[in-house]
């Protein structure tokens, strides 16, 4: 076949949190278990909250990074607790045996906050020693310091790597590290509701709006810091109230952070010219600091692991600039949602709660419809067998018949060698089979080379693309929408892609080594690691009625994976139309803030998962916004019944039509002999022979685990050794 194609919190000392390890005597401390979380966010409750339990002995813990072995930039914000009436002046602090005298401030709960700077690359042993009536007590915090430019845990960095600092107004940078000095600029919010540049933050113009943060009215002036971390350009925005004071608190900050993530999916090799966006009235008007980086945009970097590293490093810098945070909320749609889900699972506590919108579970799971839609579109254009528009739509599964075309036009080139190369990557360095076989390959898989490895025969990243045994149109056949003859012709002519991403007549075959590595790395989001202990409000802006790739079944795909892992009480799905986007976003942000606040205030017994479920705010649960803008509570399920499903019907996609279960976690199915009793259709003897020739090794058996499927190795995997 032919192939074409209002700050509302008080002193920083209110920040509470249990310790992973409490240290008394000569012992070793670990980082926060609850980290930056605090008692309450509203003013009344914050004032009434207890001052905090005094430690029985000396303790030290990292605040700016919950994983002290992954600290970067030569400094770390720490909290020290001392026994009795001792003060920080009574303590002897050393790093690797040498006396240091960093500045500390006393917090409201009696602990001491300070920044340990000047750390050497590698291991630093920060020790606090005090004399008490019972003798000398010590606590030690081992910190492993990494370069600000990275990497930390993501493994060897891509080269070449093209810089784009000038797109952000920063100085030009040199490859491959793309470092540039940080700069601060200012904007203000006008009374007309827009942001405008401002040269002097101490002198806002007459049309400047005001914002109330922590019961204090301030000019709505925004401080924006830009610089480079982990080879990414980062941005941090917060209400300006003078120079940030990490040890004294900032009257313009509510001590909470929103971290934004951007969409897309592409192969990297460049810095990126945008972030997830930080100048956002929804967040800033409530007193949040907002942060992001260019490597937190999946279209610049389709690796959730690199994104996790960049987010961790940028967040560390935020906390060392502004001080401890109560919690961090993730935000972003599409590829931004992928990063939230995947980081929450594989690198938990970088974000404490997530607000994914128009979500997908992970990049690999979206490969199915990307490839399938390219193949199906090509097949239906080339075949001599007639398929009606209704039959084609049923085979593809989407509500809108053009959704498959949208998938193909948006992302099919991301599996090819050079079809999606960013303009920042010079043509001269790009791969060419004849003239530049060692050149840059731009496929999205390039971003996970450290996890999957390379095929030594081709130099390409080992592929997880596979459609062997996939019975395209199976559900359509079983429902009588297509005939056995059409089913046979479809599966005979569908073809696949080769290692360069080009359409070929043969079906795609995954690299078996890549399959096992993908599952081990949690690149197929299991939903069973950190995500099981992360509050989730999945914002499903319903777009199925048009040719849009962001179809609603994906929220339920992720839910099904979480159900398979034994819990879904931490996920809320909220469906709405475009007319309710602002209302839904505002509600979800405030609800998540309250949810995290409630959890932090819960000192009762139970697992983290128990606390998530029992501290969900009253009124928060599955539901939707009706056409009149009213939000209703209604338990949601895939293809369930009720007012919400009637208003927002959920359909399918090509792999679900082909019989794959809702969890959609099979990269390559195991095979079983054809069983004609499962089709609900009559095949002639000749047709049976034809179908067996189409599937000589059998068809997908979804009652068995996927080939290579295994539990992930765990959270916080370090790929530093390559």
Regions from the PLM with identified roles:
Residues 35-722:
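C-terminal His-loop and adjacent cap/lid subdomain of alpha/beta-hydrolase
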């Amino acid at each position: 076949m032919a192939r074409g194609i209002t700050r509302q919190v008080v002193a920083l000392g209110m920040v509470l949190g249990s310790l992973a390890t409490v240290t008394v005597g000569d012992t070793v401390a670990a980082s926060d278990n609850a980290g930056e979380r605090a008692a309450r966010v509203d003013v009344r409750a914050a004032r009434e909250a207890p001052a905090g339990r005094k430690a029985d002995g000396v303790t030290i813990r990292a605040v700016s990074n919950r994983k002290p072995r992954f600290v970067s930039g030569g400094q770390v914000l720490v909290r020290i607790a001392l026994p009795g009436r001792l003060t920080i002046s009574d303590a002897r602090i050393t790093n690797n045996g040498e006396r240091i005298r960093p500045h500390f401030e006393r917090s409201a709960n009696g602990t001491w906050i300070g920044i340990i700077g000047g750390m050497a690359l590698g291991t630093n042993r920060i020790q606090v020693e005090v004399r008490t009536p019972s003798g000398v007590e010590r606590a030690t915090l081992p910190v492993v310091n990494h370069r600000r430019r990275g990497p930390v845990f993501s493994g060897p960095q891509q080269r070449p790597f093209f810089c784009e600092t000038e797109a952000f107004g920063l100085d030009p940078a040199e490859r491959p590290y793309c470092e540039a000095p940080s700069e601060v600029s200012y904007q203000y919010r006008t009374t007309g509701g827009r942001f405008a540049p401002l040269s002097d933050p101490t002198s806002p113009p007459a049309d400047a709006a005001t914002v109330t943060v922590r019961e204090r009215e301030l000019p709505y002036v925004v401080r924006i810091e830009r610089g480079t971390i982990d080879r990414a350009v980062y941005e941090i925005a917060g209400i300006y109230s003078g120079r940030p004071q990490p040890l004294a608190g900032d009257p313009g900050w509510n001590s909470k952070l929103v971290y934004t993530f951007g969409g897309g999916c592409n192969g990297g090799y460049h810095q990126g010219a945008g972030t997830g966006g930080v100048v956002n009235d929804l967040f800033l008007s409530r007193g949040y600091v907002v942060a992001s980086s260019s490597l937190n945009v999946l279209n610049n970097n389709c690796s959730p692991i690199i994104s996790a590293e960049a987010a961790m490093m940028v967040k560390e810098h935020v906390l060392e600039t502004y001080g401890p945070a109560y919690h961090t909320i993730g935000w972003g749609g599409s590829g931004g949602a992928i990063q939230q889900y995947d980081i929450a699972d594989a690198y938990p506590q970088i974000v404490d709660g997530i607000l994914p919108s128009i979500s997908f579970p992970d990049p690999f799971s979206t490969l199915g419809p990307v490839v399938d839609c390219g193949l199906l579109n090509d097949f239906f254009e080339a075949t001599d067998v007639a398929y009606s528009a209704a039959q084609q739509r049923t085979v593809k599964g989407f509500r809108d018949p053009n959704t498959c075309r949208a998938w193909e036009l948006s992302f099919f080139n991301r599996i090819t060698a050079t079809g999606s190369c960013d303009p920042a990557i010079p043509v001269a360095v790009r791969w060419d089979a004849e003239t530049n076989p060692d050149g840059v390959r731009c496929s999205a898989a390039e971003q996970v080379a450290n996890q999957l490895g390379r095929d030594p025969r081709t130099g390409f990243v080992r592929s997880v693309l596979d459609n062997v045994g996939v019975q395209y149109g199976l559900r359509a056949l079983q429902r009588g929408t297509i005939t056995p003859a059409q089913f046979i012709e479809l599966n005979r002519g569908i073809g696949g892609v080769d290692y360069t991403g080009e359409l070929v007549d043969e079906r795609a075959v995954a690299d078996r080594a890549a399959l096992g590595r993908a599952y081990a790395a949690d690149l197929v989001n299991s939903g069973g690691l950190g995500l099981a202990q992360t509050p989730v409000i999945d914002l499903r802006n319903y777009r199925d009625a048009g040719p849009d790739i962001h179809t609603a079944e994906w929220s339920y795909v992720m839910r099904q994976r979480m159900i398979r892992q034994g819990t879904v009480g931490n996920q809320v799905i909220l469906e709405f139309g475009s007319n309710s986007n602002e209302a839904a976003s505002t509600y979800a942000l405030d609800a998540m803030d309250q949810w995290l606040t409630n959890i932090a205030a819960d000192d009762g017994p139970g697992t983290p998962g128990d606390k998530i479920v029992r501290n969900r705010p009253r009124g928060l649960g599955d539901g939707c916004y009706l056409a009149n803008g009213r939000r209703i509570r209604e338990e949601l399920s895939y293809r369930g019944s009720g007012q919400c499903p009637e208003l927002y019907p959920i359909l399918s996609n090509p792999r679900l039509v082909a019989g794959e279960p809702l969890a959609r976690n099979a990269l390559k199915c195991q095979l079983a002999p054809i069983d004609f009793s499962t089709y609900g259709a009559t095949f002639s003897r000749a047709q049976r022979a034809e179908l067996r020739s189409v599937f000589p090794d059998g068809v997908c058996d979804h009652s068995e685990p996927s080939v290579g499927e295994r539990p992930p190795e765990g959270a916080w995997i370090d790929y530093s050794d390559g």
